[in-house]
Amino acid sequence: MIPQTLEQLLSQAQSIAGLTFGELADELHIPVPPDLKRDKGWVGMLLERALGATAGSKAEQDFSHLGVELKTLPINAEGYPLETTFVSLAPLVQNSGVKWENSHVRHKLSCVLWMPIEGSRHIPLRERHIGAPILWKPTAEQERQLKQDWEELMDLIVLGKLDQITARIGEVMQLRPKGANSRAVTKGIGKNGEIIDTLPLGFYLRKEFTAQILNAFLDVKPL
């Protein structure tokens, strides 16, 4: 069922909290792979199916009619994120005049339904649990941090300084190669303004940032 309101979406998400992947997959008649090595997107697909997400692999938000993006957040036994969170691909060409206010990243992060999930690899996939959902909108300070990082990274892209971009740049968000392998190439802007072949780059939220979101929800002060 496709949720028609935020309340319906949150209610559906709360109804699957506490289930294991195996229990939910059996309910939806979806086969469970032995692990995620060849099925990296399986958990996201499972939750999308369970919650009635509409976007599939399109560039819009998962629940575009509600203005909500769905993000799974693998956490360890201590409740800390295990990995960075992909937001969207960076526009490496045709990006002059793009501002934070109308950027794809801001659109994707304007309202997120976070679904924490057990991610420790020693737990068999079928036995990993789904956590309580978090419906999140950036605070003014979080938006400031995201905007600052986005502008700094986009400046490097627009000015043809792709070779200067490293994963260390950015307080809460970073740019990293995004592709199934290093043979995936796209077009970008070179040092002299020429069009070059380069690796696709994606915006990723740092683990410290998503940990802050979890802590705020749990009202636990970070150590």
From Swiss-Prot:
Subcellular localization, per the record? Cytoplasm
* Keyword Acyltransferase among UniProt keywords: no
How is this protein named in the record? DNA mismatch repair protein MutH
The organism's superkingdom is given as: Bacteria
- Does the record carry Amino-acid biosynthesis as a key word? no
Q: Which keywords describe this protein according to UniProt?
A: Cytoplasm, DNA damage, DNA repair, Endonuclease, Hydrolase, Nuclease
InterPro entries attached to this UniProt entry: DNA_mismatch_repair_MutH, DNA_rep_MutH/RE_typeII_Sau3AI, DNA_rep_MutH/T2_RE_sf, Restrct_endonuc-II-like
Query: Which GO BP terms sit in this record?
Result: DNA modification; mismatch repair
Tell me the gene name: mutH
MF terms (GO), sorted A to Z: DNA binding; endonuclease activity
Function, in words: Sequence-specific endonuclease that cleaves unmethylated GATC sequences. It is involved in DNA mismatch repair.
Give the matching SMART domains: MutH
The family classification in the record reads: Belongs to the MutH family.
The UniProt entry, under CDD domains, shows:
MutH-like
- Pfam families per the UniProt record, alphabetical: MutH
**Primary location:** cytoplasm
**GO CC terms on record?**
cytoplasm
